[in-house]
A protein has these predicted regions:
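Glycine-rich phosphate-binding loops of nucleotide-dependent enzymes
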Residues: 2-512
Length: 512
């Protein structure tokens, strides 16, 4: 019956130019349940929740609360109905304090005067009640990502929201913070609050959700009770085929040193401190070494230094015995370095170029693609067509497709095809599966393992601990710009890695 559901989204359709993001989707949320929303990258999950939160208006369909139709024209309407949302990218004012962010827009006042003491009292009471420890006077710019998420949750609770939407809430958290968030969700459930939980992490769904609705390509695939399903069944519903969730690989057979990093330091002039501090390690042929850590701990800057995007302050980098510390990006590429960048749009592709032109960005100057100083379009097309077929890159018009119009997964496949086809000595893969669905992740993992097995040295930089544990032969943890530990994935645990990632431990000592 309708009254069993606190929220019903019935036959929702939402269109954008050229795409139907939500196509006749129905979702029903019970009071006091954790309801997961699962789907591939681009399946329409965030769009559907943005409709519920009033950020988008649907072309068709209706929303009911407790059986009565409601109009949600904007987020203020949603808040008035008790609906709150923690976005994947937090909506906080960095130069404001924690307290000011929580009460922003609903500041208590008396005769026009701000009642900050009253607000502080309510915030601290909520913080204590739900175990969401925060410093109300700290600037948001000075607190950790995990703390920022607590601030976002307290924003919802301060507004007395009873329907809580979490959009990919664990993407930037340590394992310990993820466990803490799961406990907080269970506490909300006991109180009778209802939670909608957008995620692509099957382990988290199995751990905390009561039911799960699956979307595929904007369409409703079904809703299942978690107690009656498996991870394999959920992944099959999500991508339409069986997916191998574990990476199959043989033990590594490391060869000679390919990458030798010695005492690398990089200074951040804006923050007036070192972003990378005296980093030293080696990567051998035929092994995958992973640099793990929470986002913002120097991994990005280190990769920029390694690939030539930024200069080192100090240190030395050797590639296959050759000093490349001061080499140009092109020279590093010629010397055998391939790079799958963290931001495929910023550093991986020229979005308004065709797919074929993107495929030769690293080699258009080579003789096979030139004649008399002019690029041979026929050879570029021939080369691109081969890579598209070999790496199963799907696009509307093949090699002539403008890259901007392709899905994230196929854009990533295009970069991987280009970088691997060069037979590199060293592959640097930075968050290669970020934002991708399980089908694309499975494919990319197989390609990386195959590259290792060919004898390539692989440096993987990842925030996903499942990926780190599955792919790595050795793990290095980076915290605040320095390597604080080296681990064997066969003998360590996610929990142990999490302590080092959070700065609670450093090999040789424990911090307080």
């Amino acid at each position: 019956m309708a009254e069993d559901f606190v929220i019903e989204m019935l036959h929702i359709t939402k269109e954008f130019p050229g795409i139907k993001a939500n196509d006749d989707i129905t979702l029903q949320l019970r009071k006091g349940e954790v309801h997961a929303l699962l789907g591939e990258n681009g399946a329409g999950k965030s769009t559907l929740m943005s409709v519920l939160f009033g950020l988008y208006q649907p072309e068709a369909g209706q929303i009911r609360k407790n059986g009565k139709e409601v109009a949600i024209r904007n987020p203020n309407d949603a808040n008035a109905l008790g609906i709150g949302m923690v976005h994947q990218h937090f909506k906080l004012v960095e130069c404001f304090s924690v307290l000011d962010n929580i009460i922003l827009g609903v500041e208590p006042n008396k005769m026009g005067f701000l009642q900050k003491a009253e607000a502080r009292k309510k915030v601290m009471a909520l913080s204590e009640k739900y175990g969401l420890r925060v410093d109300p006077d700290a600037l948001v710019s000075d607190i950790s990502v995990g703390m920022q998420q607590r601030v976002e949750i307290l924003k919802m609770l301060y507004r007395d929201n009873e329907i809580l939407i979490f959009d990919e809430p664990t993407a930037v958290l340590t394992p310990q913070e993820i466990d803490e968030l799961m406990e907080i969700m269970r506490g909300f459930k006991k109180e009778g609050k209802s939670i909608l939980f957008i995620t692509h992490k099957l382990n988290e769904i199995m751990a905390v959700a009561d039911r799960c609705t699956v979307l595929r390509k904007g369409k409703y695939m079904g809703t299942v009770d978690i107690k009656d399903t498996t991870k394999e069944e959920l992944s099959r519903m999500m991508v339409g085929r069986d997916v191998q969730l574990q990476v199959e690989k043989q033990p590594a057979k490391p060869g000679a040193v390919v990458l030798d990093v010695q005492n690398v330091t990089m200074h951040n002039d804006q923050r007036k401190k070192d972003s990378v501090k005296d980093v030293t390690f080696q990567v051998h042929a035929g092994e995958i070494v992973c640099l793990a850590g929470i986002e913002g701990n120097g991994q990005t800057e280190f990769v920029y230094g390694l690939t030539g995007l930024e200069k080192l302050t100090n240190g030395k980098i050797t590639l296959d015995g050759k000093d490349i510390t001061h080499a140009t990006i092109r020279q590093r590429s010629k010397d055998g370095m391939s790079h799958i960048p963290e931001d495929r749009h910023k550093h991986g592709l020229v979005l308004d170029y065709s797919l074929e032109n993107n495929m030769v960005l690293q080699r258009y100057w080579q003789p096979e693609f030139q004649k008399g100083g002019f690029i041979r379009s026929d050879k570029v097309r021939e080369y691109s067509d081969r890579l598209i077929a070999q790496y199963d890159v799907r696009s509307g018009q093949g090699s002539s497709t403008i890259v901007r119009s392709m899905s994230g997964g196929n854009q990533q496949k295009a970069i991987i095809a280009r970088e691997l086809d060069r037979d590199p000595k060293l592959l640097i893969a930075v968050q290669p599966t970020r934002g991708l669905d399980v089908g694309a992740i499975e494919y990319i993992h197989k390609q990386i393992v195959a590259e290792r097995d060919k004898g390539t040295a692989v440096l993987l930089v990842s925030l996903e601990l499942d990926e780190v544990m599955n792919l790595s032969d050795r793990i290095l943890v980076m915290y605040e710009g320095e390597v604080v530990g080296e681990f064997d994935p066969k003998t360590t645990t996610v929990q142990e890695l999490g302590l080092y990632m959070a700065g609670a431990r450093k090999q040789g000592k424990e911090t307080k």
